[in-house]
């Protein structure tokens, strides 16, 4: 009987470990910039971030230009 209980405990631990692993999915943060902007020479709009030294990570931005005062315009716009 002890072997059966031990086996059930092992199965329960393994199932909970795999279930917890599936819940974690790497995604970009939901919060985005509220303002739109356009860099010189670009036709499409980007996201304007205030008080940032550059574009935030994990948002998929691949181009940026700096604007006045203390703002950065990041491309491409995700989700639009």
Swiss-Prot record:
* Superkingdom, taxonomy of origin: Eukaryota
Subcellular localization is given as:
Secreted; Nematocyst
Main subcellular location? secreted
Q: Which UniProt keywords apply?
A: Cleavage on pair of basic residues, Disulfide bond, Hydroxylation, Nematocyst, Neurotoxin, Secreted, Signal, Toxin
Name of protein: Delta-actitoxin-Amc2a
Q: Kindly indicate where the leader peptide sits in this chain.
A: 1-19
Spell out the residue numbers of the propeptide.
20-30
How is this protein annotated for GO cellular component?
extracellular region; nematocyst
Gene Ontology molecular function: ion channel inhibitor activity; toxin activity
* Originating species: Antheopsis maculata (Sea anemone)
From the record, give the cysteines joined by S-S bonds.
Answer: 37-73, 39-65, 55-74
Q: Which family does it belong to?
A: Belongs to the sea anemone type 3 (BDS) potassium channel toxin family.
What Pfam families does this protein's entry cite? Defensin_4 (PF07936)
Q: Which residues carry this modification: Hydroxyproline?
A: 56
Q: What does this protein do?
A: Neurotoxon that induces paralysis when injected into crabs.
